[in-house]
Design a protein with these regions (language model features):
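Carbohydrate-recognition beta-sandwich/jelly-roll modules
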Residues: 1-343, 347-348
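Low-complexity, Pro/Thr/Ser/Gly/Ala-rich linker/spacer regions in secreted
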Residues: 2-3, 652-655
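A general secondary-structure boundary signal
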Residues: 43-47, 633, 651-653
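Short, surface-exposed, polar/charged, turn-prone segments marking secondary-structure boundaries
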Residues: 76-77, 650-652
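Catalytic domains of carbohydrate-active enzymes that cleave complex glycans
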Residues: 204-639, 644-649
Length: 655
């Protein structure tokens, strides 16, 4: 379906254009350019190289024009029958971020699906990149009505000045026929499948980097540093940020947060159980005391996030409450067999249920437990995925199937919405997927591929759209691939959210129905994180950027083309627990120690929502992934040799 076209019309307008068999040439006063079209993975790479001897100003929009408009149906039937996914993702006020730059449009007039992907490392010419561009549908009425899909400036002035030199403009597109529009969720699945082959899967290896088990041991040592702790009103807890590490004074708060205590304590309990490390005992008890400082604010069935607090401190950012009080707290209660913490969780769940029902499961970004009503104007409906996760945990702790009914309603409600209404914290989507897979395991056995599995796949795919798929030319000191935008529109990755997104993947990939997921793609992202997440720690960033003690507590922020700060916000103690999650997920088993270091062994025994039981398997399992473009022979737990195909996975078991 490919026909040569001018991708940069703003440049062509000031050029003399010549069409040849396999390329388009343009010349002007002191500049020349060439556009080439190359078939690849069922689509076409479109590459334009501009060479200019002087500053050149034009609109760099790159658009695939799909058809003309009659000014009759274009604002009604024409658009009503389109299916559109824009990029990057946005927050619930519509402000865009800088994650996956891929979009798709179904055109009912020509019955075509068009998909475009603008690789994030091909924007050296755009200083602020996605601060000033988005990828979406476009309608133009001058000089003649037409519509298309592509990269568009979002700033008030669409004109950009290009300095003397060479500039490369590059994107990939694919068009296929389709008799009917897909739902946005189905279109998203097609988009992810189409662009997966474009991902460069080889990770960047850091020479002499320690394994994540060694990182966890160093983090455990750092967590004993006084700079991590604060004592106030007779209670001691972990600060949100290491004292002395924040340029903007986030480390000076005279309080501590439940989020921080729960973030560290839960994975620390699991890590201690796996490793038998007795030197974690004192820290565990100290954190348990801090968690017990949080009591239900009566009569509101609410657990606050900050200590100290009063009975009027009922205003909340909803995802804090649903993640910490309704997911991590019950886990801590289960692992410590603490009946009081279990009661606190079940009481808090009553409050979470009241807000869910009052909002018809379309949860707000902010709320107040004083009346369990929304506050302000924004939604965060993805929090319903966390609510469903809390309900799944409550069911396992009580046996009450009413909790599963609540989880079903919550997930079914948000899945009726278009995907763009669910983007906020990316890990919300992982919890939603884990809850959906749990519901599948309790569905009728004859339904091999239930709607719950497909729903879980959809939530995972949406989280992948919040991921970073390519290197960022503005930050050569680290590789952002495999990380996730910390929150919709924030435009930087954070270690906490990175690991919390993939925490659920161990359980998802280790349970029946995992074949519905993009397994190799998840493995590639997990492998990227295994290799690239070191960038959040002092020993692996430039010395000039380091600040404060505790080198093995992660910084919150790393720079991108859009967000220009690294290690400015401080070392986030509420993300330190993710080092222990990383050790659980990535600690290389013995059989992998003689395999190439770029190969992944992801543990499939790290739980997310499935509480451990007496029936938990004794055999360890791993997902092995080969990121290379050629097959590689590897060792297995049984000492057999396995030939692993390029970019493929294999599940292996060991004693």
């Amino acid at each position: 379906m490919h026909k040569p076209f001018v991708p940069l019309e703003g440049l062509a307008e000031i050029s003399r254009v010549t069409y040849e068999a396999d390329r388009i040439l343009g010349t002007g006063d002191g500049f020349a350019w060439e556009t080439r079209f190359t078939a690849h993975e069922g689509g076409i790479w479109v590459e334009t190289t501009l060479q200019t001897e002087k500053a050149l100003t034009f609109n760099p929009a790159m658009i695939i024009w799909l058809g003309t408009l009659d000014n009759l149906n274009d604002r009604q039937a024409h658009t009503w029958r389109q299916t559109i996914l824009r990029a990057p993702t946005t927050n619930q006020q519509g402000l865009g971020g800088n994650d996956l730059p891929a979009a798709t449009l179904y055109d009912p007039d020509h019955r075509t699906h068009t998909l475009v992907y603008f690789p994030p490392d091909a924007f050296q010419w755009a200083v602020h990149r996605f601060y000033e561009f988005s990828i979406r549908e476009v309608t133009e009425y001058r000089p003649a009505p037409r519509y298309g899909l592509g990269l568009l400036p979002t700033s008030p002035s669409p004109l950009f000045t290009f300095q003397p030199g060479t500039h490369l403009f590059r994107f990939w597109y694919k068009q296929t026929l389709g008799d009917a529009p897909l739902s946005q969720w189905a279109a998203q699945n097609s988009l992810i499948n189409a662009i997966t082959p474009l991902l460069e899967t080889q990770p960047t290896l850091i020479p002499d980097s320690p394994g994540w088990e060694a990182m966890a041991q160093n983090t455990l040592k750092d967590l004993h540093d006084d700079a991590c702790w604060i004592t106030i009103q007779g209670k001691t807890g972990l600060r949100a940020y290491v004292r002395g590490s924040s340029e903007v004074k986030r480390d000076e708060a005279q309080s501590f947060e439940l989020m921080t205590q729960a973030d560290v304590l839960l994975p620390l309990l699991l890590w201690r159980k796996k490793t038998g490390r007795k030197d974690a005992d004192n820290l565990v008890e100290k954190l348990l005391d801090a968690v017990r400082a949080y009591q239900i604010i009566e009569p509101h069935s609410y657990v606050p996030n900050h200590y100290p607090y009063t009975n009027t401190d009922t205003f909340m950012d909803t995802w804090y409450f649903y993640e910490n009080a309704l997911i991590k707290l019950p886990w801590i209660a289960a692992l410590t067999d603490d009946a009081d913490l279990k009661r606190t969780f079940l009481t808090a769940l009553e409050g979470g249920r009241e807000l869910a029902r009052k909002t018809h499961y379309l949860l707000p970004l902010f709320a107040d437990a004083n009346d369990w009503d929304p506050r302000h104007s924004s939604l965060n409906v993805g929090v319903s995925g966390m609510y469903a996760a809390g309900c799944v945990l409550a069911y396992q702790m009580t046996g009450d199937t009413a909790h599963l009914d609540e989880a079903k309603i919550a997930l079914s409600t948000i899945h009726q919405l278009p995907p763009h209404m669910l983007t906020h914290e990316p890990q919300q989507l992982s919890f939603a997927a884990a809850a959906a897979f749990f519901l599948h395991s309790h569905a009728a056995p004859e339904n091999a591929v239930s709607n719950w599995l497909l729903m879980g796949r959809d939530f995972v795919n949406l989280s992948l759209r919040m991921g970073y798929w390519g290197k960022d030319p503005a930050v050569p000191f680290y590789d952002v691939r495999g990380m996730f935008q910390a929150c919709a529109s924030l435009c930087y990755p954070a270690y906490k959210e990175n690991v919390e997104v993939i925490w659920a993947w161990s359980e998802l990939l280790g349970t029946p129905g995992y074949e519905t997921l993009p397994v190799s793609l998840l493995a590639a992202f997990a492998n990227f994180q295994r290799c690239h997440n070191y960038a959040f720690f002092d020993p692996f960033i430039p010395a000039s950027m380091r600040r404060g003690p505790c080198p093995y507590i992660p910084y919150e922020d790393l720079a991108t083309s859009e967000f220009t700060h690294t290690a400015t916000l401080g070392k986030e103690l509420y993300g330190a627990g993710e080092v222990f999650w990383s050790a659980l997920l990535f600690d290389a088993p013995d059989f992998m120690r003689h395999n190439p270091p770029d190969l992944l062994a992801l543990s499939l025994d790290v739980p997310c929502l499935r509480l451990p039981t007496l029936n938990t398997p004794n055999k360890s399992r791993w997902l092995i992934y080969n990121p290379r473009g050629e097959a590689v022979e590897i060792n297995t737990p049984t000492q057999d040799r396995l030939l692993l195909a390029p970019k493929s996975t294999q599940i292996v078991e060991g004693a």
